[in-house]
Amino acid sequence: MSLQSLLYEMHGYRVKPMTREEIVQVALPIAKYLKFTEWHKQRSKFEWILETLNEIVNIEIFSEQEWNELTKGLTQAHYSPNELTIRTTEKTYQLACQGDRDALGIILHELGHMFLMHQTYLHKSNEPPTINENPEWQADTFAEVILESMGYQTKQLSLNFESPEM
């Protein structure tokens, strides 16, 4: 059992393990194909790019009120593999069309679930799960890789607010 396994607690289901490098090998060709790349970083094109996604995946857009009734505000978007459908709010979709990094990250995260082929399976293992088996980490990594290829900053600052010892 690795230290990583001891420190890591996963919520939800397991998927096929993938390293960051394996996710990059999936994400970058998809980003290029869908024209999610730095040289296409023109806000006017994002709406067109997101509209062309409808050829690959259904996108259902809900009003904020409908979404809150449906999800109780627990999530900003959802991907259903059985229906090949991404569901999100009108606000998130519109912000993504305008090139908002956080909104694009939400849509790309859900696309990550689709392109990384996340399915819920029954799974029995005597080994504790690792982060590489976490579908949320994988989808976050997929989104991060594409956002970086588009020229967005994804690394967050870590600030230490603890008072220095005297």
Question: Where does each model-flagged region fall?
Answer:
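Active-site hotspot residues in diverse enzymes, especially metal/ion-binding acidic/histidine motifs
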Residues: 1-166
